[in-house]
Design a protein with these regions (language model features):
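N-terminal Sec signal peptide and the immediately downstream disordered periplasmic leader
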Residues: 2-92, 214-219, 357, 462
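Outer-membrane beta-barrel translocator/receptor signature
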Residues: 145-150, 157-161, 172-183, 189-250, ...
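Short loop/turn motifs that connect adjacent beta-strands in outer-membrane beta-barrel proteins
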Residues: 47, 190-193, 206, 222-227, ...
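Surface-exposed, low-complexity loop segments enriched in small/polar and acidic residues
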Residues: 144, 247-256, 296-342, 348, ...
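Periplasmic plug
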Residues: 111, 116-167, 195-198
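C-terminal beta-signal and adjacent terminal beta-strands/loops
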Residues: 734, 745, 844, 894-912, ...
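N-terminal plug
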Residues: 43-46, 54-110, 131, 136-143, ...
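C-terminal beta-barrel architecture of Gram-negative outer-membrane proteins
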Residues: 666, 836-942, 957
Length: 996
């Protein structure tokens, strides 16, 4: 069977499964919540409490979770049966998680190594993450250079009691950032005894090693003794997975064997940077400066234009092109990794105490460490200048050269007394008498210098609170939180600008045989760059609630409260001296104090009708204020059916990266020149479908957007509403359906017309016309940096490398969809119980309304500029089926589904979603990424008094990630947000836990 036939078969199987899933797809139902939220791991000695709880999104205790707002609850029992072992995977499995979701597998973004959720696809900045109802410090590096979020990797998993996901706006309760929804991770309140778990596993390919251990110990019967103390620790390690280990198509950008495009020019073009150096003779206008190479090629017409240095060192064969012979490389296969090395550990503790019969208190402390080690492709010798540096330091424009002469000092070598001919320059001897005409322009990748980063993130967090009651009338609470997030980022392999000049002029670096270079030479050329950054949050919350009087349906309750919160960020510039090629200059600084007052009123008007109203006023020290109201209702005409709905307004305050006057960044997105440009530069095909034809200048490259903070920005605002039904015709089955609609206005965007600016640039005939065309797009748009000219077509328009764009409040976005859920809980026999829970989200619309038209994202790769550019799948869902055989044995199958995605993105220039706008450039071919289904199987057996042994097979049927050729070049042909399990493949895990 060939690959194409196999792929067609997989599509048929996936489509059939999708049809089956779509008939049941849902989000956790209200009845399921009442059944599932009771923590299966609660200790037998836990204190007895009443059956009231506080559900995320309300200030009141209530007897059930059937609030007017849709809430999904993930219990530890559900997560264990799904084989999930960290908070990131748990939360990102929610079907409401959409575009902009960040997984640890996305390693090339600004905040690589962090993980975040993006509810409703509105971005990580529009999702509020709480721990026990309180905020935490944001990850010190902003996603996409400006989006703020809490790193999910920093939250201890073994202490999780349950995770509640509120899927509508909640600014009226929690303030800023809750536009898309709220994730509240609830940790254990008390624990008595000793509990531990050990887990290990391996992928079927022999890698992706996984180890995890946790231990919790506690004492003090709170019910009888009035106190409880527990401590907890956990450790997790996950090994690397290379692209090479997963084979085609995840280890190459050459899809020509299945009818795609060959974007791997490292095995066919001598102007592609690779570990073999290629040189061609050019002029050198300043013999003391390697950055002053000329544009025109000076080789004789009857000689090859390019010469390979060290051609005899080729390990994968050679290729012959019209301009010379070179070594074959597939750089993705040789250097890239799918999963980084990850290590996490944490220590946590809590003291709960009763001050009196009416006052209770608690104190918690936690420390978590998350380490991520990323390997990347080695750095190259031709680079643009760092963002903010002078164009004169660019090594790509017109091109860095090896001089004819070298000397010990590296200064004025052409006239130095101790000068020698440059052994790295094959033209040196012939042009010893005329060194200005014998320079060797070089294309090279430092394959002997490992490139990557180590990211250590330490989060310190402490909370304390007192809760009590006054005269059986007023319930009050005061809670405080302090969180400090410290990040240490160590970058490896980035080339120092001055050191490169020195190494070239002294000849200390061997380009002919790089294996002979000493570690000292490599370290001097690419010293490690260490950058510390940190963020801090502290807040004090206080509220009181009171039952005012009794209505026909129950007690009318009122809650009022206030908050004061301080936040700060110091995200330091990794390249503050502008002395290193390719290293980002993104930075963000700021601090503010927020004061807020809020209220909530809950009125059970009748037994059949509950009405809820709330509001919050927030004032920011920057000078702006915002009032956020919310209204909700729940109507239950019969026990079998209920209707519910909410309306709310919310806001997202500008992040420090967006508004800080000292903040800046240059973000890069994979871009492919339009076909007309490719054809002009030697490509083949037509204006709709074209190929680079071996010219690397025509292939996908990184196009930057340069932007600085704008202190005049105003908050984003939102309007959202939900309407749904809860149906429970029989006790063992329930169903919910909720429609949501969110409008986010006054969006804070970076260059909303960047696509128009790029199109205007490429449509121009020369550089001056291109600069004028980009400037005509609007204020703040300009050409910052252009590439060196195409060596094969030096008289044509060069590519743009960075286009300046403004931060502005502009446009509005509307997203809508349907959440569905169903739960069945049947006792098949006296000893066999079957539980089936299914949840899913169907995205109806996701539209950005701009001055030039509507950008439609639903079911496409749009918004491509957001985070990992993994798009907005229309349908996501999860279905868990469990058979329990008495009390001793259970078998669970958890199925996850992601619908197909069209490889177009209307934020990339064209508002059309037709396949003619395929980002891959092949029209109808490869226009869709196929649906994806994975199945995780878990078998658990109880033993002794509290022991559990489990065997898990993740991705049991070894489903492969569907091919996504338009994905970012850093993740060739796959989508890390949705298809990660299909990259790792089948995994085997085993765990044993005990409790006593």
């Amino acid at each position: 069977m060939n690959l194409a036939t196999s792929l067609r078969g997989q599509r048929l199987r996936v489509s059939a499964a999708a049809i089956a899933l779509s008939t049941l797809v849902c989000a956790t139902s209200a009845w399921a919540q009442d059944t599932a939220v009771a923590p299966a791991t609660a200790p037998e000695t836990a204190p007895k409490e009443d059956n009231t709880i506080v559900v995320t999104g309300t200030l009141f205790r209530r007897a059930n979770t059937e609030t007017p707002s849709p809430v999904t609850v993930l219990t530890t029992d559900y997560l264990n049966k799904a084989g999930i072992s960290n908070v990131s995977d748990a939360i990102r499995s929610i079907s409401a998680d959409g575009a902009g979701s960040i997984g640890t597998g996305f390693q090339s973004g600004f905040s690589a190594g962090g993980s975040a959720v993006s509810l409703r696809g509105l971005g990580v900045s529009s999702t509020l993450v709480l721990v026990d109802g309180l905020r935490s410090a944001n990850f010190p590096i902003n996603d996409d250079g400006h989006n703020a979020y809490v790193d999910l990797n920093s939250i201890p998993f073994s202490l999780v009691d349950k995770i509640e996901v509120l899927k509508d706006g909640a600014s009226a309760t929690y303030g800023a950032d809750a536009i898309g929804g709220v994730v509240n991770i609830k940790l254990k309140k008390q624990f008595v005894g000793l509990e531990g778990k050990a887990e290990g596993g391996l992928a079927s390919r022999g890698d992706a090693a996984h180890q995890r251990i946790s231990l919790t110990a506690g004492f003090g019967n709170y019910e009888e003794q009035g106190f409880n103390v527990y401590v907890n620790g956990e450790y997790q390690h996950d090994g690397r997975v290379s692209n090479a280990s997963r084979g085609f198509p995840y280890n190459t950008t050459d899809l020509s064997s299945i009818g795609g495009i060959d974007k791997n020019t490292a095995d066919s073009a001598m102007t592609t940077a690779s570990p073999t150096a290629y040189v061609t003779r050019v002029a050198q206008t300043d013999l003391n400066n390697p950055l002053s190479g000329g544009t025109a090629l000076l080789n004789p017409a009857n000689a090859s234009q390019y010469t390979a240095l060290g051609l005899g060192n080729c390990t994968s064969g050679t290729f012959t092109a019209s301009n010379g012979t070179g070594c074959k490389y597939d750089l993705v296969n040789q250097y890239r990794q799918i999963q980084p090395l990850q290590e996490r550990y944490s220590a946590n503790g809590r003291i709960s105490f009763r001050v009196s019969d009416t006052i209770e208190g608690y104190v918690t402390g936690s420390y978590s460490h998350s380490y991520v080690s990323i390997w990347g492709t080695p750095q190259v010798i031709r680079n643009t200048q760092p963002f903010g540096a002078a164009p004169s330091v660019a090594s790509s424009n017109p091109g860095i050269v090896l001089p004819v002469y070298i000397c010990a000092s590296g200064v004025n070598c052409a006239t130095a007394a101790n000068r020698t001919l440059n052994p790295n320059n094959p033209y040196a001897a012939a042009y010893a008498a005329n060194p200005s005409q014998g320079a060797a322009r070089i294309y090279y990748m430092f394959g002997d210098i490992a490139s990557g980063s180590d990211r250590s993130n330490d989060v310190y967090r402490a909370t304390a609170g007192l809760h009590g009651r006054i005269a059986d009338a007023w319930d009050w609470r005061v809670d405080g939180v302090y969180a400090y997030d410290k990040l240490k980022l160590v970058q490896h392999g980035f080339i120092n600008i001055a050191a490169l000049t020195q190494a070239i002029n002294t000849g200390s670096y061997n380009f002919v045989n790089p294996s002979l270079n000493s570690d000292a030479v490599r370290q001097a050329l690419a010293p490690d760059k260490t950058t510390p950054s940190h963020s801090e949050t502290y807040a004090l919350d206080a509220s009181v609630t009171r039952k005012l009087f009794t209505l026909p349906g129950g007690d009318l309750q009122l809650a009022v409260g206030g908050q004061i919160r301080h936040e700060m960020l110091e995200n330091n510039n990794q390249n503050v001296a502008l002395d290193t090629y390719s290293l980002t200059t993104a930075s963000a600084f700021g601090s503010h104090t927020v004061s807020a007052a809020f209220f909530e009123l809950d009125a059970p008007v009748f037994k059949q009708l509950e009405v809820n109203a709330s509001g919050r006023f927030d004032h920011y020290s920057e000078g702006f204020s915002r009032f956020s109201p919310k209204f909700g209702f729940k109507f239950t005409p019969t026990k079998a059916i209920a209707l519910r709905g909410t309306y709310s307004q919310g806001f997202r305050a500008p992040t420090f990266a967006e508004s800080g006057p000292r903040s800046q960044y240059a973000g890069f997105v994979s871009s492919t020149p339009p076909c007309a440009y490719i054809l002009a530069h030697g490509g083949t095909g037509n204006t709709t479908t074209c190929s680079a034809n071996g010219n690397p200048y025509n292939t996908t490259y990184n196009l930057g957007r340069g932007v600085v903070g704008n202190p005049n920005l105003q908050p984003e605002t939102s309007r959202s509403f939900t309407f749904g039904t809860i149906v429970q015709p029989v006790r063992w089955f329930s169903l919910t359906v909720d429609y949501y609609n969110v409008k986010k206005s006054n969006l804070i965007v970076t260059g909303p017309d960047i696509g128009k600016a790029v199109s205007a640039y490429f449509a121009s005939s020369n550089l001056d016309a291109a600069k004028a065309a980009v400037a005509a797009v609007g204020p703040g748009y300009s050409v910052n940096t252009v590439d060196a000219v195409d060596p094969l077509y030096p008289n044509l328009l060069p590519r743009p490398l960075i286009i300046n764009v403004p931060y502005v409040n502009a446009n509005y976005m509307v997203t809508s969809g349907i959440d569905l859920s169903a739960t069945a809980n049947l006792r098949l026999t006296d000893k066999i119980r079957w539980t089936s829970r299914i949840e899913g989200t169907y995205l109806l619309t996701s539209n950005l309304h701009t001055a030039t038209g509507i950008q439609s994202y639903a079911g496409t790769f749009g918004p491509y500029d957001l985070s990992s550019g993994n798009g907005s799948p229309r349908l996501r869902g999860n279905w868990q089926n469990t058979l329990e055989f008495g009390e001793a044995f259970s078998l669970s199958l958890t199925t996850s589904y992601v619908g197909r995605i069209k490889e177009v993105a209307t934020d990339q220039g064209s508002l059309s979603t037709d396949c003619s706008q395929n980002l891959y450039g092949t029209g109808d071919a490869f226009c869709y990424v196929s649906p994806f289904i994975t199945n995780d199987l878990t078998a658990s057996m109880k033993f002794g008094n509290g022991g559990v042994f489990s065997l898990m097979v993740k991705n049991a049927f070894d489903a492969r990630a569907p091919i996504a050729p338009a994905a970012y070049s850093s993740a060739p042909n796959f989508l890390t947000s949705w298809h990660y399990a299909g990259l790792i493949g089948r995994e085997y895990r085993a765990s044993v836990s005990f409790k006593m």
